[in-house]
């Protein structure tokens, strides 16, 4: 491992541990040339599928973008940041389990809607109204009826 301070290529590992959340190996290192210490983290690199938008363009998957859209739907709702992160992790696990290089944005939207429905019905309706581009009040009423009756058409 190259020293970030002097660029020397020989470093000694002083300590190795799992990170608190268990998703990385934390290593404390010392440079043999300048004697400075630094920490490195070793993580598994995951490759998410590219997202194919409705217009046919492709964009890289973005956890931040997904989180922003869920936060917007959950704005001023009693849902913790931890619950949002857990929902996003479940969505990501499903995306990785598909094993595909590309997936349509509509499929991601449906996964988001399922998770929002579990978290908060109001947020689900907010997201659905934008995501499904309701044309009239009848479509909105259908989703409201679906949520209040506890049935799911999708």
From Swiss-Prot:
Pfam families: ATP-cone, Zn_ribbon_NrdR
Cofactor: Zn(2+)
Textual note on the cofactor: Binds 1 zinc ion.
MF (Gene Ontology): ATP binding; DNA binding; zinc ion binding
Zinc finger (unnamed): 3-34
PROSITE patterns linked to this entry: ATP_CONE
Example GO BP: negative regulation of DNA-templated transcription
Coiled-coil residue windows: none
Domain ATP-cone: 49-139
Record's keyword annotation contains ATP-binding: yes
Keywords: ATP-binding, DNA-binding, Metal-binding, Nucleotide-binding, Repressor, Transcription, Transcription regulation, Zinc, Zinc-finger
Family membership noted in the UniProt record: Belongs to the NrdR family.
Function noted in UniProt: Negatively regulates transcription of bacterial ribonucleotide reductase nrd genes and operons by binding to NrdR-boxes.
HAMAP family: NrdR
Protein name: Transcriptional repressor NrdR
Biological source species: Cupriavidus pinatubonensis (strain JMP 134 / LMG 1197)
Organism taxonomic ancestry: Bacteria, Pseudomonadati, Pseudomonadota, Betaproteobacteria, Burkholderiales
């Amino acid at each position: 491992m190259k020293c970030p301070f002097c660029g020397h290529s020989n470093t000694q590992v002083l300590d190795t541990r799992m990170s608190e959340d268990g998703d990385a190996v934390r290593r404390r290192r010392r440079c043999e040339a300048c004697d400075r210490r630094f920490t490195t983290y070793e993580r598994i690199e995951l490759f998410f599928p590219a997202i194919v938008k409705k217009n046919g363009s492709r964009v890289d998957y973005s956890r931040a973008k997904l989180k922003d859209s869920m936060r917007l739907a959950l704005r001023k709702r009693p849902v913790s940041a931890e619950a949002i992160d857990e929902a996003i992790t479940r969505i990501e696990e499903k995306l990785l389990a598909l094993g595909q290089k590309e997936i349509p944005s509509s499929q991601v939207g449906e996964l988001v809607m399922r998770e929002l429905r579990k978290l908060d019905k109001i947020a689900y309706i907010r997201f659905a109204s934008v995501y499904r581009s309701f044309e009239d009040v009848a479509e909105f009423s259908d989703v409201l009826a679906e949520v209040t009756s506890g049935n799911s058409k999708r």
